[in-house]
Swiss-Prot record:
Family annotation (NCBIfam families): hemE
Pathway annotation: Porphyrin-containing compound metabolism; protoporphyrin-IX biosynthesis; coproporphyrinogen-III from 5-aminolevulinate: step 4/4
Annotated site, Transition state stabilizer, chain positions: D72
PANTHER family the UniProt entry points to: METHYLTETRAHYDROFOLATE:HOMOCYSTEINE METHYLTRANSFERASE RELATED, UROPORPHYRINOGEN DECARBOXYLASE
Self-association state and partner proteins as the record states: Homodimer.
Protein name as annotated: Uroporphyrinogen decarboxylase
Family listed: Belongs to the uroporphyrinogen decarboxylase family.
Keywords: Cytoplasm, Decarboxylase, Lyase, Porphyrin biosynthesis
Assigned EC number: 4.1.1.37
Lineage, broadest ranks: Bacteria, Pseudomonadati, Pseudomonadota, Alphaproteobacteria, Rickettsiales
Subcellular localization, as worded in the UniProt entry: Cytoplasm
GO biological process: protoporphyrinogen IX biosynthetic process
Organism encoding this protein: Orientia tsutsugamushi (strain Ikeda)
Amino acid sequence: MSKIIQAFNSSNRNYTPIWFMRQAGRYLPEYQMLRKTTNSFFELCYDPIKAAEVTLQPIARFDFDAAIIFSDILVLPDSLGINIRFINNLGPTAEKIPNLLDLQKLKIQNTKISKVYEAIDIVRKKLNKQKSLIGFCGGPWTVLTYILGYNSRNTPKFQEIKSNNKHELILDSINILTKHTIDHLENQILAGADIVQIFDSWAGILPYQEFSEYVIKPTSNIVKTLKEKFPHIKIIGFPKGAGKLYHKYTKETNVDGISCDYNLPLNEMLKLQKNALVQGNLNPNTILSEDSKIIEESVIKIMDTLSNNRFIFNLGHGILPETPIKNVELIVKLVKNYHSSE
């Protein structure tokens, strides 16, 4: 049993596991070297051998407790035939689908997305059994926002989406994407993932009612379906920006773990631990600091608050490309050598 699975089961409270979102990526020189051997980001994602190598790079360097497969939430719409482009300093961007009704006609192109599962299989065979392998997907709502032409620069605006698309059409589209998402996660589990994480990056823009319909309901459906087939698999949800709705999400989706963004106060995370394992929430900007004391104080504060219960140390969002490697090394050392003052 991996150390992270032990954390879910509360069977090893003397050890806090650690991994970082986007831990395999641009801040690593070894990643930069490998990236130069491919023509595009997605070419790297769809090369099983190279994607597996990238996935394992941060494990070799930092001894993280989990590997997360090197991929992207947009491989799913890409495999449906929606044109995805990688734009420098912006990342993967989907070409806006002309009409959401067209989404119903699209079929998965297995030749593309199956490469992700091949990479997972390679990683699982090379990865120490004490390490977990995390598969992931985008939440159906978040994937839908990209299909509608939004991205990290042109951020989704709920009222704009609502005025341009009928509520029933949005729900139908989310239902279609939910089915594809379940298939995608099932295939990752069959390939060797023992944990999956659902990244709902744009959950936080939704009002209460739509949050329930567009985020909680499909996530609950995903969790229920996966648990029926794979009861041993752990599922982490990440409804970024959900604020007070983190509690509603955790209770109603039945996720095993809840990943928290850096805007959620630690005392709220402490409350969430009553219903699930919590993960997070160090601000990625904090670890850009040249002052090691600032980093140390932030890490210790999180550990003091959360490490006595079900907890995985992580960031509140993905690691930034300009992050100094020495700062990551410091955090790993602090977490692994931490001893509670209680």
